[in-house]
Protein backbone atom coordinates (compact mmCIF):
# COMPACT_ATOMS: atom_id res chain seq x y z
CA UNK A 1 0.00 0.00 0.00
CA UNK A 2 2.81 2.43 0.80
CA UNK A 3 4.37 1.96 -2.65
CA UNK A 4 1.07 3.00 -4.27
CA UNK A 5 1.27 6.39 -2.57
CA UNK A 6 4.35 7.23 -4.64
CA UNK A 7 3.05 5.73 -7.88
CA UNK A 8 4.81 2.39 -7.71
CA UNK A 9 3.46 -1.12 -7.57
CA UNK A 10 0.22 -2.28 -9.09
CA UNK A 11 -1.09 0.99 -10.43
CA UNK A 12 -1.83 1.64 -14.06
CA UNK A 13 -2.70 4.96 -15.64
CA UNK A 14 -2.74 5.93 -19.29
CA UNK A 15 -1.67 9.38 -20.49
CA UNK A 16 -5.39 10.13 -20.92
CA UNK A 17 -5.99 9.25 -17.25
CA UNK A 18 -3.13 11.55 -16.26
CA UNK A 19 -4.38 14.43 -18.43
CA UNK A 20 -7.86 14.01 -16.94
CA UNK A 21 -6.33 14.08 -13.44
CA UNK A 22 -4.57 17.36 -14.29
CA UNK A 23 -7.86 18.78 -15.62
CA UNK A 24 -9.72 17.66 -12.49
CA UNK A 25 -7.17 19.39 -10.27
CA UNK A 26 -7.28 22.51 -12.47
CA UNK A 27 -11.08 22.57 -12.20
CA UNK A 28 -10.90 22.19 -8.41
CA UNK A 29 -12.65 18.84 -8.39
CA UNK A 30 -14.87 18.50 -11.42
CA UNK A 31 -14.21 16.76 -14.70
CA UNK A 32 -15.84 15.79 -17.95
CA UNK A 33 -15.82 12.28 -19.40
CA UNK A 34 -12.85 12.15 -21.78
CA UNK A 35 -13.79 11.52 -25.38
CA UNK A 36 -12.25 11.63 -28.83
CA UNK A 37 -13.93 13.67 -31.53
CA UNK A 38 -12.44 14.23 -34.95
CA UNK A 39 -14.96 16.83 -36.02
CA UNK A 40 -18.54 17.71 -35.13
CA UNK A 41 -20.72 20.76 -34.87
CA UNK A 42 -20.81 21.69 -31.17
CA UNK A 43 -24.57 21.21 -31.09
CA UNK A 44 -24.18 17.52 -31.98
CA UNK A 45 -21.86 16.66 -29.09
CA UNK A 46 -23.56 14.08 -26.89
CA UNK A 47 -24.84 15.65 -23.66
CA UNK A 48 -23.06 13.06 -21.50
CA UNK A 49 -19.79 14.71 -22.55
CA UNK A 50 -21.02 18.14 -21.43
CA UNK A 51 -22.05 17.00 -17.95
CA UNK A 52 -19.80 17.97 -15.05
CA UNK A 53 -18.83 15.11 -12.75
CA UNK A 54 -17.57 15.90 -9.27
CA UNK A 55 -15.05 14.16 -7.05
CA UNK A 56 -15.82 13.67 -3.38
CA UNK A 57 -13.04 16.13 -2.48
CA UNK A 58 -14.17 19.62 -1.52
CA UNK A 59 -12.93 22.30 -3.96
CA UNK A 60 -11.08 24.21 -1.20
CA UNK A 61 -8.66 21.31 -0.73
CA UNK A 62 -7.35 21.70 -4.27
CA UNK A 63 -5.80 25.12 -3.62
CA UNK A 64 -2.76 23.77 -1.77
CA UNK A 65 -2.17 21.16 -4.48
CA UNK A 66 -2.43 23.83 -7.18
CA UNK A 67 -0.05 26.14 -5.32
CA UNK A 68 2.46 23.29 -5.05
CA UNK A 69 2.12 22.50 -8.76
CA UNK A 70 2.63 26.17 -9.57
CA UNK A 71 5.80 26.27 -7.45
CA UNK A 72 7.13 23.10 -9.10
CA UNK A 73 7.21 25.03 -12.38
CA UNK A 74 7.68 28.66 -11.32
CA UNK A 75 9.81 28.58 -8.15
CA UNK A 76 12.93 30.71 -8.00
CA UNK A 77 16.01 29.02 -9.49
CA UNK A 78 17.77 26.82 -6.97
CA UNK A 79 14.73 26.48 -4.71
CA UNK A 80 13.96 22.90 -5.66
CA UNK A 81 11.23 23.24 -8.29
CA UNK A 82 11.44 20.03 -10.32
CA UNK A 83 9.75 21.43 -13.43
CA UNK A 84 11.64 24.68 -14.01
CA UNK A 85 12.18 23.74 -17.68
CA UNK A 86 8.40 23.99 -18.15
CA UNK A 87 8.17 27.63 -17.06
CA UNK A 88 6.89 30.09 -19.66
CA UNK A 89 6.79 33.75 -18.69
CA UNK A 90 3.20 34.98 -18.37
CA UNK A 91 1.46 31.60 -18.71
CA UNK A 92 1.25 30.49 -15.06
CA UNK A 93 1.73 26.80 -15.84
CA UNK A 94 1.10 24.40 -12.93
CA UNK A 95 2.68 20.96 -13.17
CA UNK A 96 3.88 17.79 -11.51
CA UNK A 97 6.90 15.82 -12.65
CA UNK A 98 7.20 12.09 -12.37
CA UNK A 99 9.78 9.42 -13.03
CA UNK A 100 8.19 6.02 -13.54
CA UNK A 101 10.57 3.24 -12.66
CA UNK A 102 11.17 0.71 -15.41
CA UNK A 103 12.59 -2.66 -14.37
CA UNK A 104 13.61 -3.38 -17.98
CA UNK A 105 15.67 -0.28 -18.77
CA UNK A 106 15.81 3.46 -18.35
CA UNK A 107 13.01 5.09 -16.33
CA UNK A 108 10.06 6.79 -18.03
CA UNK A 109 9.68 10.59 -17.99
CA UNK A 110 6.25 11.90 -16.90
CA UNK A 111 4.77 15.37 -16.56
CA UNK A 112 1.19 16.56 -16.08
CA UNK A 113 0.24 20.20 -16.23
CA UNK A 114 -2.46 22.76 -16.82
CA UNK A 115 -2.57 26.49 -17.53
CA UNK A 116 -3.25 29.19 -16.71
CA UNK A 117 -3.39 28.65 -12.95
CA UNK A 118 -6.50 30.73 -12.22
CA UNK A 119 -8.39 30.25 -15.49
CA UNK A 120 -7.42 26.81 -16.82
CA UNK A 121 -7.81 26.34 -20.57
CA UNK A 122 -5.68 23.26 -21.23
CA UNK A 123 -4.38 20.17 -19.44
CA UNK A 124 -1.56 18.02 -20.82
CA UNK A 125 0.09 14.74 -19.88
CA UNK A 126 3.45 13.85 -21.41
CA UNK A 127 4.80 10.32 -20.97
CA UNK A 128 8.14 9.67 -22.64
CA UNK A 129 9.28 6.05 -22.38
CA UNK A 130 12.88 5.31 -21.43
CA UNK A 131 13.75 9.01 -21.21
CA UNK A 132 14.59 9.49 -17.52
CA UNK A 133 13.49 12.31 -15.24
CA UNK A 134 10.14 14.04 -15.83
CA UNK A 135 11.53 17.52 -15.38
CA UNK A 136 14.26 16.92 -17.95
CA UNK A 137 12.27 15.47 -20.84
CA UNK A 138 8.49 15.43 -20.47
CA UNK A 139 8.12 18.88 -18.86
CA UNK A 140 9.72 20.89 -21.70
CA UNK A 141 7.72 18.98 -24.33
CA UNK A 142 4.43 19.53 -22.49
CA UNK A 143 5.16 23.21 -21.87
CA UNK A 144 5.78 23.82 -25.57
CA UNK A 145 2.39 22.24 -26.33
CA UNK A 146 0.70 24.43 -23.71
CA UNK A 147 2.41 27.56 -24.99
CA UNK A 148 1.48 26.85 -28.62
CA UNK A 149 -2.14 26.15 -27.65
CA UNK A 150 -2.54 29.28 -25.53
CA UNK A 151 -0.58 31.76 -27.64
CA UNK A 152 -0.48 30.15 -31.10
CA UNK A 153 3.31 30.48 -31.06
CA UNK A 154 6.36 29.49 -29.03
CA UNK A 155 8.70 32.03 -27.47
CA UNK A 156 11.57 29.70 -26.58
CA UNK A 157 13.30 28.97 -29.88
CA UNK A 158 16.30 27.34 -28.20
CA UNK A 159 14.06 25.00 -26.18
CA UNK A 160 12.00 24.12 -29.26
CA UNK A 161 15.16 23.40 -31.28
CA UNK A 162 16.53 21.27 -28.43
CA UNK A 163 13.32 19.23 -28.13
CA UNK A 164 13.14 18.68 -31.89
CA UNK A 165 16.73 17.41 -31.89
CA UNK A 166 16.11 14.72 -29.24
CA UNK A 167 16.01 11.10 -30.31
CA UNK A 168 13.60 9.65 -27.77
CA UNK A 169 13.13 6.43 -29.74
CA UNK A 170 16.34 4.83 -28.48
CA UNK A 171 17.66 2.39 -31.08
CA UNK A 172 14.80 2.89 -33.52
CA UNK A 173 16.23 4.44 -36.70
CA UNK A 174 15.03 8.00 -37.23
CA UNK A 175 15.01 9.56 -40.68
CA UNK A 176 16.54 13.05 -40.48
CA UNK A 177 14.69 15.88 -42.22
Model-derived features: where do they sit?
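Active-site beta-strand/loop architecture of penicillin-binding DD-peptidases
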Residues: 1-53, 60, 66-156
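Short, highly charged C-terminal tails/helix-capping segments
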Residues: 156-177
Amino acid sequence: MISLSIGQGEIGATPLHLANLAATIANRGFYYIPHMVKETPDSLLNNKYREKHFTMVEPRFFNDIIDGMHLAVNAAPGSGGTAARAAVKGLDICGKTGTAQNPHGKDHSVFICFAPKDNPQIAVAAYIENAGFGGTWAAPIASLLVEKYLTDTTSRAAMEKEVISWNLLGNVPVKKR
